[in-house]
Amino acid sequence: MPELTRERLGALRVQAKELLAADRREVLVCAGTGCIAGGSLKIYDYLKSECEKRGLKTRVALRHEGGDDAIHFKKSGCHGFCEMGPLLQIEPEGFLYTHVRLEDCDEIIERTILGGEAVERLLYELNGVRYAKHNEIPFYAKQQRVVLENCGTSDAEDIEEYIAKGGYSAFEKALFEMTDEEICRDILDSGLRG
């Protein structure tokens, strides 16, 4: 394995950001424990295989071969909204579907993946109002996520996507900018325990 340098890490981050910036069709299936218990991995497998049966190109990694028109299937981390799972998010529209079941998958493929339309009955509803997008839902709208800002939006199994979204930046700073003493002081000053 080649030596890790700041330049190599920076180049990898730039490449991954470029791949991530493209306005492509993405299907993010929550792979948090609550959603998995509700069947999200079966939903992921079914959606991906059914799209392939219909002749649609699919991919499961940020870096791939086969063209930019491939549908990117992702297993995301927990969205923090477990009682509404299994959750499914479709990009670029940003639709967030709740309580998704296997029986919903064919309609999702037809209406959303192929047609770009929301399946209204799967959108989050509160007091008679349906919310199409994650950031519109009152539960999320009042939150200011810092450490978990990418939770539910990233492929939990793709390290390049993690790096593109700033992953390892603290490690990079510690490795290339700080002394051992500064690292120890920052950790002690942070008050972290455990």
Locations of regions flagged by a protein language model:
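Feature of Fe-S/electron-transfer and energy-metabolism proteins
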Residues: 1-194
